[in-house]
Amino acid sequence: MRKIASIVEMQRLATQWRRRGIKISFVPTMGYLHDGHLSLVREALKRVGRNGKVVVSIYVNPTQFGPMEDFSKYPRDLKRDLKLCAEAGVDVAFCPGDAEMYPSGGKRSVASPYQSRGTDEAVPSTGFSTYVVEERLSQLMEGASRPTHFRGVTTVVAKLFNLVQPDVAVFG
């Protein structure tokens, strides 16, 4: 199994696979893998067959945490996650850092959604002002109490899809 942290390297590899007609299955995660994640990997392997490739992303996305949500305490164990991925037959563990995914240097955005609320930002600011927003479903259930959560999720998933270019994505 190969660990990739660079967006450019992930894009190059995905492009090589696609040019050779290799199917790519993708399992996006925030790491700290468990049996549920591994069942998603097994499904991903089935979906592309033995000639396909499986990419698992391991990235704790700061944009899906709101104020007063403890981004810094989200559990992480990359060494264990990589071992589990290798044992499960994953081809690539894509593990970008925040500087790769949001390369703004951590500058606070003038349009920060937290500034208007008068709260302190509990997660690293990305400095970005462009996001992918789903306006109907994100207002229900968890979205009702976490107003920026799904904006962060939809944005990072769109970015990951553009990088990995999967034929299949498996979510749990």
Enumerate the language-model features and the residues they cover.
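Nucleotidyltransferase catalytic core that binds NTPs
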Residues: 1-172
